[in-house]
């Protein structure tokens, strides 16, 4: 895989962000931010961390959510699945980001290994669920940017929202098989012509 320059990565992000954002919101069954101003969201750093995820969330929801980009201060769950206890979000989130850093932000991996690792980290950050709402869209943008820096693109178009929800539910129970299948469809190698 040929490594992209920073300029090529930025152009690729500019080409992908709007279309991908719309498809990402469909996975939330239309529950995305009302005024995200996605065109103004720059490609983040090649070494993102929890503060960058917070920045993405703040950018997306600043016009409609008090405390956008701030870590939640109450426990939440989805059905029977509890997310990380709010008092541990920062600690666990920073540990996850340190692990991602140890994995070199997934740079240099072949597609199959990249797919496995991004599924793992997506599931872990999903279980962290650092914000009161808007986690899914913010996470997907975070991982879209991570993928670009690693030489891949993510394309959420054509992913069924119910399949996505079921895959995330299975991941929460420790089975990443369905997430791996979806990410195998979503991930493709970034092209130099971007």
Predicted region positions:
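FIC/Doc superfamily catalytic core
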Residues: 1-194
């Amino acid at each position: 895989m040929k490594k992209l320059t920073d300029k090529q990565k930025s152009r690729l992000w500019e080409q992908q962000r709007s279309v991908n954002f719309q498809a990402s919101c469909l996975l939330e069954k239309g529950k995305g931010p009302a005024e995200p101003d996605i065109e103004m969201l720059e490609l983040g750093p090649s070494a993102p961390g929890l503060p960058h995820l917070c920045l993405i969330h703040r950018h997306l929801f600043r016009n409609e959510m008090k405390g956008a980009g701030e870590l939640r201060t109450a426990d939440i769950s989805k059905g029977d699945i509890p997310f990380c206890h709010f008092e541990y979000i920062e600690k666990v989130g920073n540990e996850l980001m340190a692990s991602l850093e140890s994995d070199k932000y997934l740079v240099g991996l072949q597609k199959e290994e990249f797919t496995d690792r991004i599924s793992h980290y997506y599931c872990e950050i999903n279980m962290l669920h650092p914000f009161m709402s808007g986690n899914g869209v913010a996470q997907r943008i975070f991982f879209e940017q991570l993928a670009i820096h690693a030489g891949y693109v993510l394309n959420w178009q054509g992913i069924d929202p119910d399949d996505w929800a079921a895959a995330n539910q299975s991941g929460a129970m420790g089975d990443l098989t369905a997430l791996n299948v979806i990410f195998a469809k979503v991930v493709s190698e970034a092209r130099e012509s971007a």
